[in-house]
Amino acid sequence: MKNLLIIGARGFGREIYNLALESIGYGTEFTIKGFLDDKKEALDGYDGYPSIISSVENYAVQSDDVFICALGDVIYKKQYVDILQAKKAHFINLIHRSATIGKNTNMGIGCIICRNVNISCDVTIANFVTFQPFVTIGHDAIIGSCCHLNTYSFMGGFSQLENMVTLHTGAILLPHVKVEEGAVVGASSVAVRKVKSGTTVYGNPATLLKY
């Protein structure tokens, strides 16, 4: 039996703790050891959660440890994943029992698949991708590493996300649309053409959001 440590004990970390209790392998392949977070008081006022054991930086990886990263910001996710991988940490996938995954879909490590996610056939998913509840992924889609897909976002067939892309709640990618590295598609936005690297688009049709 492996011991799961959750990176991040804030709001999303608490959600992932609850997800882990309902995920494939809980109680047979892994149990939950606790959280890693540099904010020691992050769980103050919240009952029933395991303790914050250490910060990521100060934690010494044990042979029976496994990890999942519960950070919604893709930049911080990559930062802390890199720290632990340098310590030879082993990451697992958390897949809720209600999720559906189609034939010939390939997935890397450290992925989070929440309740009622629907991933179609022949999809390619890299490492450390988060799918929040009710995300739908069309056939032959490609998703790069450290992406975060928020609730009810949708990717059409043959669409593509490069690394570290964020789709906010209800974002839609039409079939064959590509979102380049580090870009953001805003909530309820519809991407009908390529989204350039490092940009944020918003609206229907999605256009460049200037600050």
Residue ranges and their predicted role:
Residues N93-L209:
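Structural signal for interior beta-strand "rungs" in well-ordered beta-sheet cores
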Residues Y17-L19, Q79-I83, I125, K196-S197:
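Short amphipathic alpha-helical segments
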Residues N3-L4, T31-K33, D64-I68:
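Short active-site oxyanion
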Residues G25-D44:
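NAD(P)-binding Rossmann-fold cofactor-contacting core
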